[in-house]
Amino acid sequence: MKFEPELESGKLIKRYKRFLADIKLEDNSERTIHCANTGAMTGCAEPDSTVFFSTSSNLKRKYPNSWELSVTENNHTICVNTLRANQLVVEAIQEQNIKELTEYDELKTEVKYGSENSRIDILLTGKSLPDCYIEVKSVTLLSESGQGFFPDAVTTRGQKHLRELSEMAQLGHKAVLFFAVLHSGIEKVSIAHHIDQQYHSLLIDAIENGVNILCYQAEMSSKEMKIVRKLPFSI
């Protein structure tokens, strides 16, 4: 995924009202940008940190700039735009970069499924293959020693998705929970049972029901983002 034009940078003043952030540019002018991430953003939104933002060509947008990346004091890069995770995984699958999913030849997004009326992030189909339901989750919470965690806050929506994936697996389909690691400092991923114990329990059930876990990391810069490597996962 290439950023065209290349992302611009500034210094974070503050994030507020969940969807907005104020930044200071190199000329000391201030600008309000849109924040697509409604989560806790733990460790991703420290005042005076460097942020990178894109500019929309849609002239009707009230806030044409979108917060894309943050750089931490340890020089780690984090993608804070939650919309990018799905786009990156779709691109990686289409470019045959996810070895576990290369046998499928058709990809759809946002397809209705399940008894709880959800929409699956990605649906893969192929001749003589079970349908493959993929739910994508962005991982940006870093603890000590390169340990990444998901989720960074209690997620009832995520719990629902695990129930839906379990249902698909039990019906004979392939079900995948795909962790897109969008923090350059993360070296391995685990479930944050200390944050959302119910999610942890549901994931154990999901794995027992046949849900597959994939965990891949992206490289990120002001010019592009790309899924590049598989990371270890533990429950």
Curated annotation (Swiss-Prot):
Top-level taxon: Bacteria
Disulfide-linked positions: none
Annotated GO MF terms: DNA binding
InterPro entries with a match to the protein in the record: SfsA (IPR005224), SfsA_C (IPR040452), SfsA_N (IPR041465)
PANTHER family with a match to the protein in the record: SUGAR FERMENTATION STIMULATION PROTEIN A
Family: Belongs to the SfsA family.
UniProt cross-references to NCBIfam families, sorted A to Z: sfsA
Name listed for the protein in its UniProt record: Sugar fermentation stimulation protein homolog
Organism, as annotated: Aliivibrio fischeri (strain MJ11)
Classification lineage: Bacteria, Pseudomonadati, Pseudomonadota, Gammaproteobacteria, Vibrionales
